[in-house]
Design a protein with these regions (language model features):
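Catalytic machinery of carbohydrate-active enzymes
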Residues: 1-195
Length: 195
């Protein structure tokens, strides 16, 4: 199995997992502002972000659409991220409209978060938001996944590939990411809710 330098060194030290916890702090003013923005929601709040800056981390848009259609009856779904986020019906779109800190403040009011390995994954962890993270296989969950999260990944022979830039292309059609089903994400969220 291919390993990156962190995994290699962890194995040499006899460590199976490095448990890191992020921290993110909001001011009282930021918290109050976000509370006013989210008080209108009458169902549990599910925050989503569908895109990372790296294409190899982006779960297919049609999967997101199916996921949203399955969840919008029971959740107020808020969409965070930047202006490149796709537009979906049945979500409260904040994507592309907020600063990073405003997005974090809104996220702090969410009950759950679903998204890719991205900045918002780290912020959600720092805010103690229960999360389902769709990793695929381009990165190692052992290196970047938080143990509190439900980290969904596949590990075909080519993974982790560590492809970062748009110049590098996946020769396997991102099967590690595309093989994570909507049902798997739904079930993972339901398991979080039961905890």
């Amino acid at each position: 199995k291919r390993q990156n330098i962190i995994e290699h060194n962890m194995n040499r030290l006899g460590l199976e997992q490095y448990d890191y916890k992020a921290s993110f702090y909001l001011s009282k003013k930021e918290k109050e502002w976000a509370k006013q923005q989210t008080i209108k929601f009458d169902k549990p709040i599910l925050a989503i972000c569908t895109k990372s800056k790296e294409e190899v981390k982006n779960w297919p848009e049609e999967n997101w659409l199916e996921l949203i259609q399955n969840l919008n009856v029971n959740f107020s779904i808020i969409q965070l991220g930047d202006e490149t986020e796709p537009t979906f019906e049945c979500v409260h779109r904040y994507a592309g409209k907020l600063s990073m800190r405003e997005s974090a403040a809104i996220l702090a009011n969410a009950d759950y978060f679903i998204g890719p390995d991205s900045l918002l994954m780290h912020i959600a962890n720092g805010l103690n938001i229960q999360s389902v993270i769709i990793f695929g296989g381009s990165r190692s969950v052992n290196c970047f996944g938080y143990s509190e999260n439900t980290n969904l990944s596949n590990t075909p022979d080519c993974s982790p590939c560590w492809i970062h830039s748009t110049d590098n292309k996946c020769n396997e059609s991102l099967k590690c990411l595309h093989n994570i089903s909507v049902i798997k994400v739904l079930n993972s969220l339901m398991d979080l809710i039961k905890k």
